[in-house]
Amino acid sequence: MSGHGDKDRDRKLGSQHSTLHERGFGGNGAVDAEQESSMSDNEQPTEYRTYRRRWIGLLTLTLMNVVVSWDWLTFAPVADLSATYYGVSKLAINWVSIAFFLAFVAVFPITIAILHRGPKLAFMIAAVLIIIGNWVRYAGSASSTGGRYGAIMAGEIIIGFAQPFILAAPTRYSDMWFTNRGRVAATALTSLANPLGGALGQLINPRWAKQSADISNMVLYVSIISTVCSLPAFVVPAAPPTPVGPAAETPKLSLKESLKVLTHSIELWLVLIPFFVYVGFFNSISSLLNQIMIPYGFSDDEAGIGGAILILVGLLFSAVTSPIIDRTKKFLLALKLFMPVIGICYLTFVWMPETRNVAGPYAVLAVLGAASFALVPIALEFLTELGHPLSPEVTSTTAWAGGQLLGAIFVIISGALTAGDDGNPPQNMNRALVFQAVVALLVCPLPLFLGLFGRGDKIILKRVRSDTRGVPSGVRIIA
């Protein structure tokens, strides 16, 4: 390859090069290793390549994120019926969600250590916990005449232990298997599958459970779906045979070194703090939307549709924005646009239930979902870029753990701020919505400070730079 040294040195990851055409492939930049013909005996260059088998893990991670979120929101969309079936109060049903959030926080240090070794082990641990947790819940719900609250709480905690292993995995998986042309989209697909599961729960569970006796079958159906979607975790490939690009083979910092970088980086915290808050409020509003809207005369189905709009519109919008960010790398601009929009949406939503008409809440929830869902993969990938060579699971697991912790705290605070039976209307959550709006507006300006005060060098996209800088002679990149 000595004759092509200068040419190879200029090649960049993800570029569409004539080399692909010379070797009989199209110029779409998506050539898989299984399709590669062997090189001549005289040329044995190092090649970076992607593999078709990466889609197995991506699909599995997507399915597991769907079902773990559906498991979380099994009871919230039918809180009244669930409370009757298990013989507890609605507050006790809220504590099922709270326990789920806190379970994430309890095991997130272990999650970082497991993901640091690779995503496959994390997938298998999550699959085992999801399957066990679901059937423990069903064991306490097998009778149509009433269930055992302790069993569903225990099962929910077990499922909560599973969530960090897959919710924090997308950035680690995309870093290992995808080039910089596809990482944001891969992270978006797998991360946003989690709220998709919540949308399915919001839409489907109220149709499965029309009366308290139906809760048993509802739990059974969710358990079967969760089991089927978790089984592929045991056949996911552990790692690509060769690195997909220069950044993928860059030695990652140790966990101790990573913790030091994380605690001392102002830029990371300017992104992490609003991420914590907005994920926490998203979890809170998803858990409590039924209780927010019903006091104003909305039905379970109307509240469920509102939750589904929040999620589905967000998914569609993120499907548009993620490929654009993948190509342009405008992470910072996107953060500075979407975070203020989210804050304004929480402020506007304070008055929406009082309209007693679905149009207002649905419109605000749609915009809130669009901005929130677009933000998630952008923020996670931007954190990875800022922290490189931190291993991606360090920033992503920390980000999600903070969001889950605040989600639990916000649900508890919202419950305490709920009006009594003498409220107008009784049991309204207006004060909780005001609290939500104030905190959301307080944190939304933080990303606006990124790159200011002479710290422009701190927001360089380090992983992208590692991928796109000149590649040494004898290296060929096939993205």
Swiss-Prot record:
GO cellular component, one term: membrane
Family annotation (Gene3D superfamilies): MFS general substrate transporter like domains
GO molecular function: transmembrane transporter activity
Segments crossing the lipid bilayer: 55-75, 95-115, 121-141, 149-169, 184-204, 218-238, 268-288, 305-325, 331-351, 363-383, 399-419, 433-453
Pfam families: MFS_1
Main location: membrane
Keywords assigned by UniProt, alphabetized: Membrane, Transmembrane, Transmembrane helix, Transport
Biased composition (Polar residues): 36-45
Region Disordered: start-end pairs: 1-45
Localization annotation: Membrane
Protein function: MFS-type transporter; part of the gene cluster that mediates the biosynthesis of peramine, a pyrrolopyrazine synthesized in association with the grass host that protects the plant from insect herbivory. Probably involved in peramine transport.
Family: Belongs to the major facilitator superfamily.
Name the record gives this protein: MFS-type transporter EF102
Organism: Epichloe festucae (strain Fl1)
Lineage: Eukaryota, Fungi, Dikarya, Ascomycota, Pezizomycotina
Gene this chain is encoded by: EF102
